[in-house]
Structures are given as C-alpha cells and as structure tokens.
A protein has these predicted regions:
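Short, surface-exposed loop and linker segments with low hydrophobicity and enrichment for Pro/Ser/Thr
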Residues: 1-2, 34-36
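Short aromatic-glycine-(Arg/Gly/Cys) micro-motifs in beta-strand/loop hairpins
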Residues: 1-13
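Polar low-complexity intrinsically disordered regions enriched in Ser/Thr and small residues
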Residues: 7, 15-17, 34, 43, ...
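Terminal low-complexity, poorly structured segments
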Residues: 12, 32, 48-50
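A short, exposed loop/beta-hairpin motif centered on an aromatic-Gly-Thr core
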Residues: 13-24
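Short, surface-exposed linear segments at secondary-structure transitions and domain or protein termini
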Residues: 23-34
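Short, mixed-charge low-complexity intrinsically disordered segments
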Residues: 36-69
Length: 69
C-alpha cells in the first residue's frame, strides 16, 4: 500500500506532500515535518520536493492511499 504524507492548511484543506511505501517511513516524515512546524519555521526547502511555505500549514499527517482524494 502507498501512504500519503498530507499537510492541512489553517483553512482545513489537505494537500499531498510526499508518498511512501511503508507506513513507518511515512510516519517518520510527518513527525519530522510537525517538529519543524513546532520550531516556528516558515519555509521548507528540499532538493527533491522544492520549497513549501509553512506559514499557512497547520499540521502533517499520514493517510493510506485509499483515503486520499
């Protein structure tokens, strides 16, 4: 199964951030991103993903591919 790391904005909209084949790996990524949010960071920059403005992001979570829309 594929798991999506999804972030939700303060307005309640969910967006796919990344995908992982293992639930544990997806949970680790979501946890690291939530830790980053807790520091007050406003920008995420990754050589694979690119830039993500964190100012409107509420939290990251993991959802099975069957629940993603």
């Amino acid at each position: 199964m594929i798991y999506g790391i999804v972030y939700y904005t303060k307005s309640g909209r969910g967006y796919l951030f990344q995908q992982a084949f293992e639930e544990q790996h997806a949970m680790e990524i979501a946890g690291k991103m939530n830790d980053l949010l807790a520091t007050g960071a406003t920008m995420y920059n990754d050589k694979f993903y690119g830039k993500l403005d964190l100012r409107d992001v509420e939290y990251f979570t993991v959802e099975p591919s069957s629940e993603m829309y």
